Amino acid sequence: MRPRKTKLGDFRPNLRGGPHQLTVNGDLPPSHFLLTLVHEIAHMKTHETFGLKVNPHGKEWQNTFAKCMEPIMEAKIYAPEIEAEVRRYLSKPKASCSADTRLLRALRAENEHSSPLLTLEEIEEGALFVLPGRKPMKRGKKRRTRYLCEELDSGRTFAVHPLAEVQLLKLKDERDFL
């Protein structure tokens, strides 16, 4: 599957009796790919068992996902630091492993060839940066799990994930953009 920025994988049931469609981004590191693949397989199994009557990431899916992960966890496929985070995550999995900062950090650490970009949490408050495909922004304070960042052109505020990859701007003054 070609790389996507918005989601790691996808399950689409065929409601007309044909085969289901399951996709996973092919550019994910192996541990992340495996977790995403099992996540989507759990959606398929949940759909086959319960149909459309259950929430996509409800209790039924969570239980199915944990069951699907059991043989993988028993086989000790993951590195110890990733395994510990996956076990913690499996106690109450979120809709995306990207929503679990600790798990995402462990999965990214495995990938030695990761992006040369910094993450938002690595830059100082007040620093200017650009998210890929966005306008210049200024990092603000952390609010619960995300950072409040101001887009310089519009003054709009966005809540940005701490592990979002950013390009730091080396400027003397933010007025260089205005």
Feature-to-residue mapping (PLM):
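Metalloprotease/metallohydrolase-associated module, dominated by Zn2+-dependent proteases
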Residues: 1-15, 21, 27-30, 51-178
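Active-site recognition of the HExxH zinc-binding catalytic motif
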Residues: 35-48
